[in-house]
Every structure is written in C-alpha cells, then in structure tokens.
Amino acid sequence: MAIRNLRFLGDELLRKKSRRVEKIDDRIQALLDDMLDTMYENNGVGLAAPQVGILKRVVVIDIGEGPLFLINPEIIEQEGSYIEQEGCLSVPGRQGEVERPYRVKVKAQNRDGKEIIVEGEEFLAKALCHEIDHLNGVLFVDKIIDVKGE
C-alpha cells in the first residue's frame, strides 16, 4: 500500500471520462488499497481513481462507517434534492454549495467482483454523486451554486 500523488484542478486528466474495469486483478486491488490510504492521509471522505491519475471507474468512500470500494459504479435511482457545502481533495481551499439528490441508489461491483447495491441519503448520497462525477470528468466546481474560499 502506498500514498499516491493527487491531481489538482487544471490537470486535464480530471476532465476525461474514465474507462470501465473489465477485470478485477491484483493491480485493481492495489489501486483500491492505495486510494484508501491516500484518502485517509489527506483527510478525505471519498476518492476517485482519476484523482490519482488513473482513468478507471474506481471509487473509495468512507463517511465514518467503514470503507466502501466501488468498481464501475452507476446511479440507478435518485430522488429529492439536497443542497450542502462541498469541497474536494483535487480543489484545495475551495468550497461551495452544490445541489445533489437527497437519496441515491448505486449499482457497482465490490472488490471481489460481486454486484452490490448501495443506497445513501444526504451525506452518503452526496459523496456517491461527487465521486461518480469524477469518473465522468465533472468536478464539484462545475455545479457550485454559491462559492466559498479562494
């Protein structure tokens, strides 16, 4: 396990769409472990593979309830509306209010390749949407309603 270098706003890679993971092998397992370590080291609650320079559809999230490892995640249901402050490890020093769904249901594979369904409301829904946006080349600054910080 290793701490990987983060990519920051202005890096073109963050604006590219990530590719599906076709095979969950040792490299993907190592990526998941490294992403989790990198997220914790930087006091984050979520991290997407593009943030460490890898254009794969891989996300890790931990909102304080233990880590979620999501491979090829996709939102299959969403409802309601929820506006709250967001920040991002790839956009240091900047926050803003973003509108997200209040509740989402996400289909993904876990690190063992098993299909899972993750349902989240409020903070978890926000984290899921934020990280899945990264996989599509979208940053929270693209969705800001009200800007805070630099």
UniProtKB/Swiss-Prot annotation:
Fe cation binds at C88, H130, H134. Its cofactor is Fe(2+). Keywords: Hydrolase, Iron, Metal-binding, Protein biosynthesis. The active site is at E131. Disulfide bonds: none annotated. Its EC number is 3.5.1.88. The keyword Hydrolase applies. One of its GO terms (biological process) is co-translational protein modification. One of its GO terms (molecular function) is peptide deformylase activity. It catalyses: N-terminal N-formyl-L-methionyl-[peptide] + H2O = N-terminal L-methionyl-[peptide] + formate. Belongs to the polypeptide deformylase family. Removes the formyl group from the N-terminal Met of newly synthesized proteins. Requires at least a dipeptide for an efficient rate of reaction. N-terminal L-methionine is a prerequisite for activity but the enzyme has broad specificity at other positions. This is Peptide deformylase. The lineage of its organism: Bacteria, Bacillati, Bacillota, Clostridia, Eubacteriales. The gene is def.
